[in-house]
Amino acid sequence: EAGIRFYNQLIDELLSAGIEPYITLFHWDYPYELYKKGGWMNDESPEWFGEYAKVVAEKFSDRVTHYFTLNEPQCFIGAGFFQGEHAPGLRCPVKDTLLMAHNTLKGHGRAVQALREFGKQPLTVGYAPTSTILYPATKHEEDVEAARKAYFSLPDVENWSWNVSWWSDPVIFGAYPEEGLKKYEAYLPKITDADMKLISEPIDIYGQNIYNGRCIRMGQDGKPEEVKRPAGAQTTAMDWPVTPQCLYWGPKFLQERYHKPIYITENGLSCRDVVSADGKVHDAGRNDFLANYLAEL
């Protein structure tokens, strides 16, 4: 109840300031009591997520019309339970993480259903994964197609979680990509037609968190290859590459594949900020970053 009260007040304040709020249902903060029951490993977890979405719709949809179900499943499953770099810092077997991923996507489907059923007005519902954008070295057709092919390809099983297609094809097309079904066959959970119908509940918009990318060209062997960045190329305070081109090519490739309105749901950088003598952070680096990225749209 305290959480609902807080968000009710926040929504009202945003609206009073002329700001349209968007709600993301899940941005990695899993309830501990449900985590102790297995979290996304538990086959009941999609139902739990649907019940939660029902409450959100009942409490907030009189004022909020735009919703994203999940934020960056590649991170909260991959980095959280596979690489062990994010909370809860586990390194689970491949088979377990693929089951978690499947339940996560089923939870997305249950949330879409709940938002549609219990929304107090027509709602705009989306999904917000992330990726490292692969952009072409030139606008020549062979480089563009090399970048596109590499972007939607599936990594080998030891790095399976960081990709586009495994997380998005089921949501849009109602099927996992064949390349992944072959590569990950020995580790897959049971996947039913009913599961895929649930996962592919129709959405209205597709979000993408875009920060940076890698440059790709067609190699002499006819396969995509990465073009290495020159020494001294610009990076952020977190040592992420600054690649404005990704804000053009990422949405372009995603829209051409999935045919949904593309929302850039996150973008930005960490800076080495300093307080100037006048007591202000003038933020020239961030201003420059945003101007260069936005110029690519």
Regions found by a protein language model. Give the residues of each.
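Active-site region of glycoside hydrolase catalytic domains
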Residues: R5-E296
